[in-house]
A protein has these predicted regions:
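Short, conserved turn/kink motifs that form compact alpha/beta structural patches or helix kinks used as
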Residues: 2-8, 33-144
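N-terminal intrinsically disordered, low-complexity, charge/repeat-rich segments that act as generic
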Residues: 1-37
C-alpha cells in the first residue's frame, strides 16, 4: 500500500487530474518514437535500420473535437494525458523535458487507431504542469 496523501498544495492538481482520467476511461496510449541511441556513423549514413521505441502513458482520455471549418475536413481529436505519466516516461527514456518527448514522437496509438500530433499544450496550477493536451489527427495509411 502506498501513501498518496499530498504533502503540499502543489501536488493536489496532479493527483486530481490522475484520478479524473482514471475514472473517465483508464485508457492508455502508446507513443511511438525513434530510438535516441542512433548516434553512430553507420546510422548517420543510413546503413542501419531505424529503430523505434514504444512508450506507454496512462491514464489518458481521448475525445473528438467539434468539427471546425478546415480545407481538408479531417476530424480532430484531443488526447488528455496525465503529467505524472509523461514525467515517468521522460525519466525512463532519460530525456530533458516533456517537449523533447513529444518532439521525438512520430505516432500516437490509442485503442488500435493511429494518430499524428498537431500541437501540444499544457495546463498548470501553482507553477506545475498537471495535464498535457495533445491535438491529434487520424493517420491515414500510406500507399506504396
Amino acid at each position: 500500500m502506498s501513501d498518496t496523501a499530498p504533502r503540499n498544495a502543489v501536488s493536489a492538481p496532479q493527483m486530481l487530474a490522475d484520478a479524473l482520467l482514471r475514472s473517465l476511461t483508464g485508457a492508455s496510449a502508446q507513443l511511438r518514437m525513434t530510438s535516441t541511441t542512433t548516434d553512430t556513423n553507420m546510422s548517420e549514413l543510413g546503413l542501419t535500420a531505424t529503430s523505434f521505441v514504444d512508450a506507454v502513458v496512462s491514464p489518458v482520455a481521448l475525445r473528438k473535437l467539434r468539427p471546425a471549418w478546415k480545407s481538408d475536413g479531417a476530424p480532430q481529436w484531443e488526447l488528455l494525458v496525465s503529467a505524472t505519466a509523461v514525467a515517468a516516461q521522460v525519466n525512463a527514456l532519460d530525456l530533458s523535458s516533456a517537449a523533447e518527448l513529444f518532439k521525438l514522437t512520430l505516432l500516437v496509438a490509442v485503442g488500435g487507431q493511429d494518430y499524428l500530433i498537431e500541437s501540444v499544450t499544457s495546463n498548470e496550477a501553482f507553477g506545475k504542469v498537471y495535464l498535457y493536451r495533445l491535438l491529434l489527427r487520424e493517420a491515414r495509411p500510406q500507399s506504396v
